[in-house]
Amino acid sequence: MIQMQTNLDVADNSGARRVQCIKVLGGSHRRYASVGDIIVVSVKEAIPRGRVKKGDVRKAVVVRTAKEVKREDGTSIRFDRNAAVILNNQGEPVGTRIFGPVVRELRAKNFMKIISLAPEVL
């Protein structure tokens, strides 16, 4: 469950290390985002010579949350930390690699590029 002011790890090699959610997209008063939702983030920490810089405002998709995600078959999955992947204006990932596992729910939301780059899909 991601809301405004939530800090997230970045799970790709775009150059950002930590981002902060500044808006949850999808509705005028939408408060929370879960796995597969698109948020607007501000880059708080970045590596030198990366594709994104500190202070950049970008869109990102949430790929891991500490709050469990309940599935239709009754199982649930949760992670230790919240993580996101930075997107460009076309909705494609900025980075060329994804670090750590991602959840199967991204497939239903048509993030196939992230699914194919991820080392593990849970």
From Swiss-Prot:
GO terms for MF: large ribosomal subunit rRNA binding; structural constituent of ribosome
InterPro entries xref list: Ribosomal_uL14, Ribosomal_uL14_bac-type, Ribosomal_uL14_CS, Ribosomal_uL14_sf
One Pfam short name: Ribosomal_L14
PROSITE patterns in alphabetical order: RIBOSOMAL_L14 (PS00049)
Keyword Ribonucleoprotein: yes
Gene Ontology cellular-component terms listed: cytosolic large ribosomal subunit
Any one GO BP annotation for this protein: translation
Record-linked CDD domains: Ribosomal_uL14 (cd00337)
Keyword set, alphabetical order: Ribonucleoprotein, Ribosomal protein, RNA-binding, rRNA-binding
Record field: transmembrane: none
Signal sequence, start to end: none
Keyword Hydrolase: no
Family the UniProt entry places it in: Belongs to the universal ribosomal protein uL14 family.
PANTHER family: 50S/60S RIBOSOMAL PROTEIN L14/L23 (PTHR11761), LARGE RIBOSOMAL SUBUNIT PROTEIN UL14M (PTHR11761:SF3)
Function field: Binds to 23S rRNA. Forms part of two intersubunit bridges in the 70S ribosome.
Complexes and interactors: Part of the 50S ribosomal subunit. Forms a cluster with proteins L3 and L19. In the 70S ribosome, L14 and L19 interact and together make contacts with the 16S rRNA in bridges B5 and B8.
Protein name from the UniProt record: Large ribosomal subunit protein uL14
Gene name in the database record: rplN
